[in-house]
Every structure is written in C-alpha cells, then in structure tokens.
Amino acid sequence: MPAEKTQNVQDVFLNYIRKNKAPVTIFLVNGVKLQGIVTWFDNFSLLLRRDGHTQLVYKHAISTIMPASPVQLFEPTKEEVEA
C-alpha cells in the first residue's frame, strides 16, 4: 500500500514565507518581539535574518509568527472558487 504524502501546516507556512522572503514578526513566549526574514528552518529551530545579521531561534520559544502580508497556504477548491 503506497504511503500518502502529507504536509503539516507548520512546514507549509514556514516554507511559503521562506521562499517568498516575506518579512515576519515573531513573538516569543517571554514577550520579546523579533522581526526579519526566515531563511531556513528544521524541526526544532529557524534562522531569522535582519540587517545582515542572522539569529537562531528555537521553535519551543516561539509563541506567534505574523507575516507582514497575507499568506495563501493551499490552492482554493473548485467549490470555494465558485462561491
């Protein structure tokens, strides 16, 4: 039986903002606000670039990631387009 390929929403979201170099605001669980562009990520951390400097941010410390512009993660279904 072939394995069904599924992607989790976190990876789809982070990949979209990485590929599109979308500016983001990241809020950490301690309230600190970081801003920049996500250049890389894995299961545990991401790299955030701003003004030529790169920060390694651990995902367990992140509360919220807010892109500066709207993000469309999935193609709309035929029913959604016709509505």
Curated annotation (Swiss-Prot):
Q: In terms of domain of life, where is this protein from?
A: Bacteria
Q: Does the keyword Nucleus apply?
A: no
Any single biological process term in GO: regulation of translation, ncRNA-mediated
* Tagged with keyword RNA-binding: yes
UniProt-recorded Gene Ontology molecular function terms: RNA binding
Q: Which InterPro entries match?
A: Hfq, LSM_dom_sf, Sm
Q: Give residue ranges for domain Sm.
A: 11-71
Disulfide-bonded cysteine pairs: these are none
Q: Which UniProt keywords apply?
A: RNA-binding, Stress response
Q: Name one Pfam family in it.
A: Hfq
Q: Single GO cellular component annotation?
A: cytosol
- What family is this? Belongs to the Hfq family.
Q: What does this protein do?
A: RNA chaperone that binds small regulatory RNA (sRNAs) and mRNAs to facilitate mRNA translational regulation in response to envelope stress, environmental stress and changes in metabolite concentrations. Also binds with high specificity to tRNAs.
Q: How does it assemble?
A: Homohexamer.
Q: Which PANTHER family match?
A: RNA-BINDING PROTEIN HFQ
| Name of the molecule in the record | RNA-binding protein Hfq
Q: Which organism is this protein's natural source?
A: Rhodospirillum rubrum (strain ATCC 11170 / ATH 1.1.1 / DSM 467 / LMG 4362 / NCIMB 8255 / S1)
| Gene symbol of the encoding locus | hfq
